[in-house]
Curated annotation (Swiss-Prot):
Keywords: Chaperone, Membrane, Transmembrane, Transmembrane helix. The gene is Dnajc4. It comes from the Eukaryota. Residues 37-102 form the J domain. Residues 96-127, 208-244 are annotated as: Disordered. Gene3D superfamilies: DnaJ domain (1.10.287.110). Residues 103-127 have a biased composition (Polar residues). It comes from Mus musculus (Mouse). This is DnaJ homolog subfamily C member 4.
Length: 244
């Protein structure tokens, strides 16, 4: 029985949703300490370098990013304030002005009431539309409203249509170029075949003429030469004797 009582809190903790634990952690963090300036919000000292401020902002942004708990508006507000603090302290001129205002201001402190933090007043005055500055810092992230989703869907469809159009146009150009190349190659091969055929026919005709001439010369050499025949004796004319 005592072992069951000891295991009961652990089982209850396992059954709690993850988002609820994040909300409780955020609420406990907000109640534990309220930063009074941008340096305390980022968790750095006033003499920190720009690289230290950048690393602190990345660390804090992972802890307070709205994607960890989209249904928690307090987490979004803290992240926007963190974004504003980094925007001011990451630039040399704005940081110099902020340090001057921070050192020159002397807010009165009373036991019965607490003054509102200075960074909160500047934050409320600087991000009148909070979403505009938030989304301007992170251009790759867009609000997930129904209207924005519809516009994003239309944009994606338009881009897809352009890609398909370019692909079809590329295929058409490739086909036309291939057909043209095929015609050029075919005409070249036909011309080459015509030249080769003409050379072959000419060579064949010359070979036939040479063979006929050689055969004729050979036949002439093989025939014997005929000797000139004497006329017969009866046909010989005797010379007449003209003596007295």
């Amino acid at each position: 029985m005592p072992s069951l009582l000891l295991q009961l809190p652990l089982r209850l903790c396992r059954l709690w949703p993850h988002s609820l634990s994040i909300r409780l952690l955020t609420a406990a963090t907000g109640q534990r300490s309220v930063p009074t300036n941008y340096y305390e919000l980022l968790g750095v000292h006033p003499g920190a370098s720009a690289e230290e401020i950048k690393r602190a902002f990345f660390t804090k942004s992972k802890e307070l990013h709205p994607d960890r708990d989209p249904g928690n508006p307090a987490l979004h507000s803290r992240f926007v304030e963190l974004n504003e603090a980094y925007r001011v302290l990451s630039r040399e001129e704005s940081r110099r002005n902020y340090d001057h205002q921070l050192h020159s201001a002397s807010p009165p402190k009373s036991s019965g009431s607490t003054a509102e933090p200075k960074y909160t007043q500047q934050t409320h005055s600087s991000w009148e539309p909070p979403n505009a500055q938030y989304w301007a810092q992170f251009h790759s992230v867009r609000p997930q409203g129904p209207e924005s989703r519809k516009q994003q869907r239309k944009h994606n469809q338009r881009v897809l249509g352009y890609c398909l159009l370019l692909m079809v146009a590329g295929m058409g150009l490739h086909y036309v170029a291939f057909r043209k190349l095929e015609q050029v190659h075919r005409s070249f091969m036909d011309e080459k075949d015509r030249i080769i055929t003409a050379i072959y026919n000419d060579t064949r005709a010359r070979a036939r003429a040479n063979r006929a001439r050689i055969q004729q010369e050979r036949q002439q050499r093989q025939q014997p030469r005929a000797e000139p025949s004497l006329p017969p004796e009866s046909s010989r004319i005797m010379p007449q004797d003209t003596s007295p």
